């Protein structure tokens, strides 16, 4: 696969302008404007915290559970926003594709970059919330950006692949939204993975092979508490530790290849 020339000055300028435009269009007409970038995941966190922590008493045995839950919520919201916006990006920019010629991948990267910027703002909120709740800052926090990069590449690969299909079959974006609602409960955002491990150790192992679950658990481990179950401290087989990363590599590679193959038809189909 030919690697996109991101370093090209022309491509960088175009990417920057598209990201700025995405931000303006996304919050255009709303009273709170850019504050929604933070408010959406915070509102979801508040609902989940009241229902599962206060009413159902979940997570009482987890250190700093509110931070634990907030980190999972913010990471999930990032993945959800990144893929949903990325999948619809080409169709949303169909008018631009028909007017000028430029690398099509920039459209998807701009949409996912906008989601990444939103996430970084929310990550700052998580860090502040963690410190307020007694989490001691450490150098291990510096590992978190590299873990997040894995989730971004996974989201980008999915966006490339499904976004290319969505140009011709517009049902894909709707199907993905339904799939995401189901996937939310298959990823340890609300509940601790220890609940799954206690019920079925095999199921917990399968859960941890999911790159999304692996990223969420790893971020919690390095950011909040080293009592968090992760792929590399729970799975005894060392080769299995690399499965989530391998899945990400396969998805970003196949997604990029398929997107490149289909991109020549985007202008007439979008």
Predicted regions located by residue number:
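Hydrophobic transmembrane alpha-helices and immediately adjacent juxtamembrane helices
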Residues: 1-270
């Amino acid at each position: 696969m030919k690697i996109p020339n991101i370093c090209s000055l022309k491509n960088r300028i175009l990417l920057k302008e598209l990201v700025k435009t995405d931000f303006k269009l996304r919050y255009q007409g709303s009273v709170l404007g850019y504050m929604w970038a933070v408010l959406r995941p915070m509102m979801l966190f508040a609902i989940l915290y009241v229902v599962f922590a206060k009413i159902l008493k979940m997570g009482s045995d987890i250190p700093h559970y509110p931070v634990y839950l907030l980190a999972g919520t913010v990471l999930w919201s990032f993945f959800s926003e990144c893929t949903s916006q990325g999948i619809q990006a080409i169709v949303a920019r169909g008018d631009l594709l028909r007017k000028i010629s430029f690398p099509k991948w920039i459209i998807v990267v701009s949409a996912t970059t906008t989601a990444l910027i939103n996430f970084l703002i929310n990550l700052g909120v998580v860090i502040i919330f963690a410190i307020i709740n007694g989490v001691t800052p450490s150098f291990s926090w510096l590992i978190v950006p590299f873990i997040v990069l894995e989730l971004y590449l996974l989201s980008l690969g999915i966006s490339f692949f499904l976004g290319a299909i969505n140009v011709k079959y517009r049902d894909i974006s709707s199907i993905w939204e339904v799939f995401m609602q189901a996937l939310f409960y298959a990823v340890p955002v609300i509940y601790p993975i220890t609940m799954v491990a206690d019920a079925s150790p095999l199921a917990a192992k399968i859960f941890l092979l999911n790159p999304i679950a692996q990223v969420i658990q790893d971020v919690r481990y390095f950011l909040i508490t080293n009592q968090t179950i992760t792929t590399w401290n729970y799975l005894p087989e060392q080769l299995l530790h690399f499965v989530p990363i391998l899945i990400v590599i396969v998805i970003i590679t196949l997604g990029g290849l398929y997107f490149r193959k289909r991109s020549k038809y985007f202008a007439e189909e979008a």
